[in-house]
Amino acid sequence: MVVEKRNPIPVKEAIQRIVNQQSSMPAITVALEKSLNHILAEDIVATYDIPRFDKSPYDGFAIRSVDSQGASGQNRIEFKVIDHIGAGSVSDKLVGDHEAVRIMTGAQIPNGADAVVMFEQTIELEDTFTIRKPFSKNENISLKGEETKTGDVVLKKGQVINPGAIAVLATYGYAEVKVIKQPSVAVIATGSELLDVNDVLEDGKIRNSNGPMIRALAEKLGLEVGIYKTQKDDLDSGIQVVKEAMEKHDIVITTGGVSVGDFDYLPEIYKAVKAEVLFNKVAMRPGSVTTVAFVDGKYLFGLSGNPSACFTGFELFVKPAVKHMCGALEVFPQIIKATLMEDFTKANPFTRFIRAKATLTSAGATVVPSGFNKSGAVVAIAHANCMVMLPGGSRGFKAGHTVDIILTESDAAEEELLL
């Protein structure tokens, strides 16, 4: 078999080539309760102000601020309570000279009142109370439209729907939401050395860990996943299963078969399905032979058969492709700074991604490699919540150095930071 020529490109360029392709999913309508993690297909515009009316942020008394002027410890001013309202109720009383309405949090400010006195700022009697300080106009009042005004864009097209966005959608009465349909993914593990999870181990064989891992990563994004039977190193059957997967899915992910060995058929498979290879080598470790192709609006990802390299390839390349297909506003991985807490002395001719454990402390983020960090490592992935990104050309890093990390999980808070 002819060895395919491979010219490594930088990670950022590889991602850019992926998101430069013309690929998009159609808009669909889903129930609000099913919209979590989808991408909005349209701007959401405020149809009324928030708050809708002047309201009280506290339990207390609504008064006229002018009546409180001159109040002090030596000159307490008395008010007469003329009404009592809770959230959802509206007083029909007009607050007059030295009058007040007992008001609960969230209730609409009654006519005539322009300030709220909290209960703890008063001395109450049966139907009166006194205060010892003056209040200014609009003090302790949440004003109509102070957060959002009619016509404001409150959620943008391309925004990920998180729980906060669901609260906004519910506020404006969206029982159904127009979103971008999420792509479906086919996962195909390849290699004659692979056994299924429930198979008995044999000499020279390993269980297929990449297939279940990729499925979990895709489902974590909310994607529909199709799992195909583990493929042996056979070109004809490989071509057939990839063609079948392309007919049913928007993204096809294969693991294994991307190196330069005698049984790595992926280049021939891409040729058979007439896919354009966007790149077949990336200047990074692990996963340098990650290959991505594109045809008819669909992506084909050839990820390494080594688990850590496979995981890295999904995080760096599959995730941005999914976001791009869904029209997300942000597609590139988010990078934050962290302090390396252990030496990592291995030289890095290419950009190196290390599975690691990050912790967010009051002094900033810290990070520790999560164990054995060769490309074939499995256990280190389970104990990692980020990847450390070490630039190519470096000769290793010492504890105390500032490094770039990409969070892959959100459980990075130190216990002492929790309330």
Curated annotation (Swiss-Prot):
InterPro entries, per database record: MoaB/Mog-like_dom_sf, MoaB/Mog_dom, MoeA-like, MoeA_C_domain_IV, MoeA_C_domain_IV_sf, MoeA_linker/N, MoeA_linker/N_sf
GO annotation (BP), single: Mo-molybdopterin cofactor biosynthetic process
Cross-referenced SMART domains: MoCF_biosynth
Annotated metabolic or biological route of this protein: Cofactor biosynthesis; molybdopterin biosynthesis
Catalytic reaction equation(s): adenylyl-molybdopterin + molybdate = Mo-molybdopterin + AMP + H(+)
Keywords tagged on the record: Magnesium, Metal-binding, Molybdenum, Molybdenum cofactor biosynthesis, Transferase
Highest taxon of source: Bacteria
Example of a GO cellular component annotation carried by this entry: cytosol
Function: Catalyzes the insertion of molybdate into adenylated molybdopterin with the concomitant release of AMP.
Annotated protein name in UniProt: Molybdopterin molybdenumtransferase
